[in-house]
Regions:
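A short, structured surface patch at a secondary-structure boundary
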Residues: 87-148, 188-195
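Short, charged cytosolic
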Residues: 1-5
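Positions in alpha-helical segments
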Residues: 27, 42, 55, 95-99, ...
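A hydrophobic, helix-centered structural microdomain
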Residues: 6-78, 114, 187-202
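An acidic site on a long C-lobe helix of protein kinase domains
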Residues: 17-21, 33, 93, 105-111, ...
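C-terminal terminal-structure detector
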Residues: 7-14, 142-202
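Short, glycine-rich, amphipathic interfacial segments at transmembrane boundaries or analogous
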Residues: 55-93, 151-170
Length: 202
């Protein structure tokens, strides 16, 4: 069930109002600028494995409203319905192109569409599948869902896949408390560094 609307502090509201206009503008510019890269990746996916270019999955967004997240498909068609829920470094379900775009985080680029549509933000807690929040308290879920989910966030630059689920939630809650333009820029810079170094990727 979707969480009830959270009561967000005055500090969070005043540090958050600028995010949507900035996200809309930056995602729109990025979609135009990166259109050639989108085309190249799309062609490589289509030429090397049968199936759609995009992978869609239902996630929980603002106020835990469900939405479809977009990624470039990196696994063989039907692999998400069988086998382990999470992938490993040498997962046979991942295609050759899939390994490359995962390692470089290029598989996340289509989430610019989610940002442009208002479903996500550049920076924020990652959008979860419902079962990933089963151990979170109702208060933690409400607070976490009081902001739009992000392509990257504090947890992702603080350990990413090496963190426990509770540690990720704790980082998410810390982000909600400290949300500001300066904080988002700091996380964005750290994210770019990690992507360049291919840190924390499968």
């Amino acid at each position: 069930m979707p969480a009830e609307p959270a009561v967000v502090s005055h500090e969070v509201r005043t540090g958050y109002f600028w995010k949507r206009p900035a996200d809309f503008m930056l995602s729109g510019l990025a979609l135009v600028a990166l259109a050639p890269l989108f085309l190249v990746i799309s062609l490589l996916i289509k030429l090397t494995s049968p199936g759609p270019v995009f992978f869609r999955q239902q996630r929980l967004g603002l106020k835990e409203r469900p939405f479809s997240i977009f990624k470039f498909r990196s696994m063989r068609t039907g692999s998400d319905k069988t086998g382990a829920q999470f992938t490993s470094a040498n997962d046979a379900r991942v295609t050759g192109i899939g390994k490359l775009i995962r390692k470089t985080s290029l598989d996340e680029l289509p989430q610019l569409i989610n940002i442009f549509r208002g479903e996500m933000s550049l920076i924020g807690p990652r959008p979860y599948i419902g079962f990933e929040l089963e151990n979170a308290t109702p208060d933690e879920r409400r607070k976490r869902a009081s902001v739009r989910p992000g392509v990257s966030g504090l947890a992702q630059v603080s350990g990413r896949s090496s963190l426990s689920q509770q540690a990720v939630i704790d980082y998410d809650l810390q982000y909600v408390e400290q949300c500001s333009l300066k904080f988002d820029i700091q996380i964005l810079i750290q994210t770019i560094r990690k992507v360049i170094r291919c840190e924390g990727t499968n």
